[in-house]
């Protein structure tokens, strides 16, 4: 039996659906049912039910974007950094394997092939040289691997508070007990929801263009479960669709497939975006998914996954989509 924490959240709901599809016995927990942020409460509960695996899909859900985290720092810290440590301690003491949904937003930029086989890190993927390289020679740009230290964190400022807490959690739980750390990036699928990247882009008044790795949410969840079911080595995994994509390219696909009745406008440059829109730094990065693929866990190339999601797009009613930020 599997214990699923954060079952009512954006990611947790997809874990619930996939576990049901696989006919897996599981208990979907929310904080309304049990205060699993309390060590004593969670420890006693785990000892009582003895799950074979625990999934932590709980965390602070920033809405409409990560700027919201700056106004709720205590809550964000508790949900994104302290809760994973509590779960890690409980799992260590009860000898329970578990998986933690982290984030790829603890990096910024990418690695670029330089002279003599060396690599250099470029934090700004929007500079003209990098955009030209991505368009003409993408093979010279490499994503961050699981062995690269996060460079968008409290230890490597500047960063936003959300990313800082996610990196802090990884640092605290890495190597503690039998644990997986799963890193998604900018999740999307065919369902119209506020945290879906494709929904966000369709509702932004102006779009900020950059280069990113992204994750088809359903494929992310399946990949996470496959790692556990295949008894893959515990550790960190970048769970993203292979490749990278510009925001402008995604918008082009939206226009071609969905044909929305609107024009898309873009911020002219980073300076304009940060002057008039963003309150905190943003993470834009490319992640390397080779470790995942080497274990036979497959995710579709990024543009194939995007095309499929848009071809099967399901528009939701406003009441079904919009809810406040908070812990799930």
Tell where the protein language model's regions lie, with residue ranges.
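N-terminal Rossmann NAD(P)H-binding glycine-rich loop of SDR-like oxidoreductase domains
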Residues: 1-21
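SDR active-site strand-loop-helix element
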Residues: 5, 29, 54-58, 98-104, ...
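Mid/C-terminal beta-alpha module of Rossmann-like enzyme folds, strongest
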Residues: 14, 223-226, 230-279, 283, ...
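Adenosine-cofactor binding site in Rossmann-like domains, unifying the SAM/SAH pocket
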Residues: 20, 24-44, 59
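NAD(P)H-binding glycine-rich loop region in Rossmannoid oxidoreductase-like domains
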Residues: 39-81, 92
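Catalytic helix-loop patch of NAD(P)-dependent Rossmann-fold dehydrogenases
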Residues: 71-78, 82-83, 105-182, 189
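NAD(P)-dependent short-chain dehydrogenase/reductase
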Residues: 159, 170-222, 226
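C-terminal amphipathic/interface module of NAD(P)-dependent oxidoreductases
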Residues: 280-328
């Amino acid at each position: 039996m599997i214990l699923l924490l954060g079952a009512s959240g954006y990611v947790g709901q997809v874990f619930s659906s996939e576990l049901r599809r696989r006919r897996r016995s599981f208990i979907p927990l929310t904080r309304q049912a049990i205060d699993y942020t309390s060590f004593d409460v969670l420890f006693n509960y785990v000892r009582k039910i003895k799950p074979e695996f625990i999934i932590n899909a709980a965390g602070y859900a920033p809405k409409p974007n990560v700027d919201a985290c700056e106004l709720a720092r205590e809550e964000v810290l508790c949900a994104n950094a302290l809760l994973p440590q509590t779960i890690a301690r409980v799992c260590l003491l009860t000898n329970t394997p578990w998986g933690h949904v982290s984030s790829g937003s603890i990096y910024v930029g990418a690695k670029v092939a330089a002279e003599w086989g060396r690599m250099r890190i470029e934090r700004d993927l929007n500079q003209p040289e990098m955009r030209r390289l991505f368009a003409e020679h993408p093979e010279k740009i490499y994503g961050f691997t699981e062995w690269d230290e996060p460079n968008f964190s409290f230890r490597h400022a500047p960063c936003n508070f959300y990313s800082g807490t996610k990196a802090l959690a990884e640092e605290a739980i890495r190597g503690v007990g039998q644990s997986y750390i799963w890193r998604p990036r900018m999740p999307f699928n065919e369902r119209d929801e506020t945290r879906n990247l494709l929904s966000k882009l369709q509702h932004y008044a102006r779009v900020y263009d950059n280069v990113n790795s992204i994750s088809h949410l359903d494929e992310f969840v399946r990949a996470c479960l496959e790692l556990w079911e295949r008894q893959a080595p515990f550790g960190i995994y970048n769970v993203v669709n292979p490749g990278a994509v510009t925001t402008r390219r995604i918008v082009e696909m939206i226009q071609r497939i969905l044909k929305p009745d609107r024009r898309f406008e873009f911020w002219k440059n980073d300076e304009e975006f940060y002057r008039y829109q963003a309150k905190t730094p943003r993470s834009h990065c490319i992640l390397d998914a080779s470790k995942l693929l080497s274990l036979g866990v497959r995710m579709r190339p990024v543009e194939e996954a995007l095309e499929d999601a848009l071809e099967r797009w399901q528009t939701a009613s406003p009441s079904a989509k919009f809810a406040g930020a908070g812990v799930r």
